[in-house]
């Protein structure tokens, strides 16, 4: 009996602390300064660890293992320039050397598939899973790492799991109950309140520190918000500062439960990517949605898949064909505190969340950008590329022309044929692509 009473007191004390110091402040969108103190201590610790590692690691090893240095040194010049030093006439057998070189570069380290795996860090951040290039430096550094493991798994993880459980449970229950109400302004207000509150709680569960820039450009009702995509928590990051009607792929498991509950309270659009009829239905729903300027802005991730936050890949044109005002948003995570990228082919949602909750924190910057509209004579593809370029520049990301669908599918023949056509034009046009 005494053991049960003690356990009950510990549990009640724990829940009281969680409720008083985290839940209530997150509901009202205020901070007690605890996370700021935690981040200051964390930054100082990682800076100290970086200095210790640099002092104890030979310079040659640092250069060799630096994540900023690839396996190979690429020649980024276009085909026309790359072949100019090899060919003297319209065609020479030596042209084979150029294509062989490019082929070997792609086999060793292509610029696409590496975007579907976690970004390597220049300096170890005291997390076991990023300890790729770390070797023993000193007893003091090892003790700091051990202390970090204890803090992350014995203190932060139970707290974060508690918050995540409360946040997700409230979201599922709240949206289900609100969904039973008839359509009215009250239902819309309650739906926004539930989404906003629960997302703030879930962000606290990840020790999220978010810096919003240019808030005067926040997406307005009746518009379309497009952003680069790294993780499902992109939705949490954006919804913490404002509500959206979301468009996305149907999921199973925990994500599916959340999706089915959310759609009861808010006109989110979930679809199956492989179904053509779903795609037509989505286009129709989106056109109807943006026609009503009283509805929430639509949140779309045009890449269609999660990229590791180093690049922005091809934007699907569908989002840019329906008209309306586009509100671009750039999201950039700081990998030094935790890896936000979701490798869906390797981890399910629960495993991914556990990895996030055992990281130091999730730190990111969000840039709202001036609204953009389709210019006269500009087709949907050109408009999509213009928006993608703006997001890449603002977020400091690499812009790539490749389709994120290559994560799941083979390269289309059209990409191979394009390279063949360029080479043919050079021969027919005497070495010019124009």
UniProtKB/Swiss-Prot annotation:
Q: Name one GO cellular component term.
A: endoplasmic reticulum
Q: Where in the cell is it found?
A: Endoplasmic reticulum membrane
TM region positions = 14-34, 137-157, 161-181
Report if keyword Ligase is assigned: no
Q: How is its activity regulated?
A: Inhibited by N-ethylmaleimide (NEM).
Q: How does it sit in the membrane?
A: Multi-pass membrane protein
**SUPFAM superfamilies for this protein:** Glycerol-3-phosphate (1)-acyltransferase
The record's SMART domains line, in alphabetical order, gives: PlsC
Q: Does the keyword Transmembrane apply?
A: yes
Query: Phosphoserine is carried by which residues?
Result: 68, 77
GO molecular function, one example?
A: glycerol-3-phosphate O-acyltransferase activity
Pathway noted in the entry: Glycerolipid metabolism; triacylglycerol biosynthesis; Phospholipid metabolism; CDP-diacylglycerol biosynthesis; CDP-diacylglycerol from sn-glycerol 3-phosphate: step 1/3
Tell me which Pfam families the record gives.
Acyltransferase
Q: Which intervals of this chain are the motif HXXXXD motif?
A: 229-234
Record key words, sorted: Acyltransferase, Endoplasmic reticulum, Lipid biosynthesis, Lipid metabolism, Membrane, Phospholipid biosynthesis, Phospholipid metabolism, Phosphoprotein, Transferase, Transmembrane, Transmembrane helix
GO terms of biological process kind = CDP-diacylglycerol biosynthetic process; glycerol-3-phosphate metabolic process; phosphatidic acid biosynthetic process; regulation of TOR signaling; triglyceride biosynthetic process
Which InterPro entries does its entry note?
A: LPCAT1-like (IPR045252), Plipid/glycerol_acylTrfase (IPR002123)
What catalytic reaction does the record list?
sn-glycerol 3-phosphate + an acyl-CoA = a 1-acyl-sn-glycero-3-phosphate + CoA; a 1-acyl-sn-glycero-3-phosphate + an acyl-CoA = a 1,2-diacyl-sn-glycero-3-phosphate + CoA; dodecanoyl-CoA + sn-glycerol 3-phosphate = 1-dodecanoyl-sn-glycerol 3-phosphate + CoA; sn-glycerol 3-phosphate + hexadecanoyl-CoA = 1-hexadecanoyl-sn-glycero-3-phosphate + CoA
CDD domains the record matches: LPLAT_LPCAT1-like
Q: What does this protein do?
A: Converts glycerol-3-phosphate to 1-acyl-sn-glycerol-3-phosphate (lysophosphatidic acid or LPA) by incorporating an acyl moiety at the sn-1 position of the glycerol backbone. Also converts LPA into 1,2-diacyl-sn-glycerol-3-phosphate (phosphatidic acid or PA) by incorporating an acyl moiety at the sn-2 position of the glycerol backbone. Protects cells against lipotoxicity.
Indicate what this protein is called per its UniProt record.
Glycerol-3-phosphate acyltransferase 3
Organism of provenance = Homo sapiens
This chain is encoded by the gene named: GPAT3
